[in-house]
Curated annotation (Swiss-Prot):
EC number(s) from the headed UniProt entry: 3.6.5.-
Protein name: GTPase Obg
Keywords: Cytoplasm, GTP-binding, Hydrolase, Magnesium, Metal-binding, Nucleotide-binding
Subunit structure: Monomer.
GO molecular function (one): GTPase activity
PANTHER family in UniProt: DEVELOPMENTALLY REGULATED GTP-BINDING PROTEIN-RELATED, MITOCHONDRIAL RIBOSOME-ASSOCIATED GTPASE 2
Organism of this sequence: Alcanivorax borkumensis (strain ATCC 700651 / DSM 11573 / NCIMB 13689 / SK2)
Residues spanning the membrane: none
Gene: obg
Lineage: Bacteria, Pseudomonadati, Pseudomonadota, Gammaproteobacteria, Oceanospirillales
Residues covered by region (Disordered): 367-391
Cofactors that this protein relies on: Mg(2+)
SUPFAM superfamilies: Obg GTP-binding protein N-terminal domain, P-loop containing nucleoside triphosphate hydrolases
Segments forming domain Obg: 1-159
Length: 391
């Protein structure tokens, strides 16, 4: 199934039914008085998360969703039938944004209850409501109210505890295969990973966490180069980042330069993302002798002045992966406990995630606008004809 993490849809709630103009008619009752009922309410539009859905692909093809209108009122004080609500099911982790106002209407991180995104119109009043001492036969009714209409952007961000990032071919997909049951495609060429992959990592029988692998980043990603920029937003909800580094690049390039380049791209894409805790994982140590690998890691750490955690692994051979998994599990459990017991820490983390998501949303929209402008400029240039007159 195609992975789609963004879609734009139009939703229209139903209109309320009109109130009824009616008078009671019975044998031997000449002036029965008004008995027009109210109109029924229109249908609301809701959005609800569903764990059985993992892509927004359906909303690429069906973009307009209309709830039914309420039925008009009837005589004998009968209220018109209200329309049924419609519920749009989306993956867990979907954010719903009003395109006209940029208001975030819902952030669906669980499946507890649906969220209303378009409110239906109320039914109109029948003429029975307008009877008075001076007007025993009112002919006045009211129309049903129109329902809300909105243009919405659905944005899917995967929910994971740990996010993997790094240059193409650093071994991220191999690592996620080594530590989880996920089976992403692995090959000896860049950009093998084209979409985010999720894997559940089990440290023990009852201890587990989720890791997300996104396409590799390259220099200039924050300006739209490569594939990874589109998927950086999926790291917004992770608790920490694993920066996977190829310790023995085939092109002889410097791993330290790769680390700096990725850090720069993170900061340019979202300063809040650059603030996320990040661990260095040096991969492919099996391609070097033990003492050579350790010496190279020490030299890189010294050159960068790195103060965070450092791990050495060979994802292909499974070396060092178990130690990494237990270290990650312990760190995640510590953070979960802190969020439950320390309100200040929980508030700070929530603020960081909110800033990260806002910055990521703004940056992605900027890049899309730039891409549209570039395409428009190319189209304009295609029709330019230069005429040169020569003697």
């Amino acid at each position: 199934m195609q992975f789609v993490d963004e879609a734009t849809i139009d939703v229209h709630a139903g209109k309320g039914g009109d109130g009824c103009l009616s008078f009671r008619r019975e044998k031997y009752v000449e002036f029965g008085g008004p008995d027009g009922g109210d109109g029924g309410a229109g249908g609301h539009v809701f959005v609800q998360a569903d764990t059985n859905i993992n892509t927004l692909v359906d909303y690429r093809y069906d973009r307009i969703f209309k709830a039914r209108n309420g039925e008009p009122g009837k005589g004998r004080q009968m209220t018109g039938k209200s329309a049924e609500d419609i519920i749009l099911y989306v993956p867990v982790g979907t954010t719903v944004v009003d395109l006209d106002t940029d208001e975030v209407l819902a952030d669906l991180t669980d499946t507890d209850k649906p969220v209303m995104v378009a409110q239906a119109g109320r039914g109109g009043l029948g003429n029975i409501h307008f009877k008075s001492s001076v007007n025993q036969a009112p002919r006045k009714t009211t129309k049903g109210k129109p329902g809300e209409s909105r243009r919405l952007r659905l944005e899917l961000k995967v929910l994971a505890d740990v996010g993997l990032l790094g240059m193409p071919n650093a071994g991220k997909s191999t690592l996620i295969r080594a530590i989880s049951a996920a089976k992403p495609k692995v090959a000896d060429y860049p950009f093998t990973t084209l979409i985010p992959n999720l894997g559940v990592v089990k440290a023990d029988r009852y201890r587990s966490f989720v890791v997300a692998d996104i396409p590799g980043l390259i220099e200039g990603a924050a300006e739209g180069a490569g594939l990874g920029i589109r998927f950086l937003k999926h790291l917004a909800r992770t608790r920490l980042l694993l920066h996977v580094v190829d310790l023995a690049p085939m092109d002889g390039s410097s791993p330290a330069n790769h680390i700096d380049a990725i850090a720069d791209e993170l900061d340019r894409f979202s300063p809040a993302l650059a603030e996320q805790e990040r661990w260095l994982v040096f991969n492919k140590i099996d391609l070097l002798a033990d003492d050579e690998a350790q010496a190279q890691v020490d030299a890189i750490v010294d050159e960068l002045g790195w103060q965070g955690p450092v791990f050495k692994v060979s994802a292909a051979a499974g070396v060092g992966c178990e130690d990494l998994v237990y270290a990650l599990m312990n760190a995640i459990e510590d953070r979960r406990l802190l969020e439950r017991e320390d309100p200040a820490y929980a508030a700070a983390q929530q603020d960081l995630r909110a800033r990260l998501e806002e910055e990521a949303r703004e940056r992605v929209q900027e890049l899309k606008a730039e891409a549209r402008q570039a395409r428009q400029n190319d189209d304009d240039d295609d029709h330019d004809v230069e005429v040169v007159y020569e003697p």
